[in-house]
Amino acid sequence: MILQVLLLVLGFLMLVKGADWFVDGASGIAERFGIPQLVVGLTIVAMGTSMPEAAVSINSALKGNAGITIGNIVGSNILNILIILGITAVITTVAVQKSTIWIEIPYMMIITVLLLVLGKSGNQITLSEGVILWVAFLLYLGYLFYCAKKNKEEVVEEEAKPMWKLLLATILGLLLVVWGSDVTVDAAKAIARGLGISERVIGLTVVALGTSLPELFTSVSAARKGKADIAIGNIVGSNIFNILFVVGTAALIVPVEFLPGFGIDTVIALGAGLLLWVCIWRKRALTRPAGIVMLIAYLAYFCVSDVVFL
């Protein structure tokens, strides 16, 4: 068991470092080709911080570990909102753009409902339903590029890294994420079997926390640097990416089982999104008291879930 825990930690470290290298390399390459920084931030960075969830969930789907696939995504989305934004808000007040309140967060909640409906309709996400999620993902990308074009900012010239270094970082980062996901899934499955608990619980808690580390580091770092407004955009973007791209891609490869307990967990994820919206819609900011409320909400969710009955 000790070996499996060490392997799980190693897998998490590989995921975090791999995602970091991928984001740096891919962002640098995109900027070298003149792609606006806003587009890079809204797409590559948000997707890059979600790479651990993507790799672990798709890998677990291929290995037939349904509990880890959906559990990781739903658990990560709950944790991203309540824990990561909660911690960030406790550190500093988080400013929120108007479009985030009225477009992006509502869209996140709509696709959460879509995931629930698709999952409960046949207790699995099928190929055709994966296509639906991908269409919704492409619509979201179209919206992002529209916003980028509308709000294009002047790019500040900086000393560029050699192209070979950017390519090397991108390739090594991607390989490290893929390898780390394999180590993480195998270790998590072994721990679940050893402790006699379900893969769903492992996916919702331990794996969700580990794969959310990039979002946590990005948001807390932004808050400390006085750029807390980046935090909500990163989290909301990552949550949308998790549902539409990750689950959608996994379903295109193999039908993804939607276990009965995931219905409640998905409703909790929807509730977390609604709580976030309620906390920010008046002042267009996420304050410290709101952050504390969100942390308490996650603690309550954790306590009333079947985790306490393990």
Which positions does each model-derived feature cover?
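Hydrophobic alpha-helical segments, chiefly the membrane-spanning helices
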Residues: 1-310
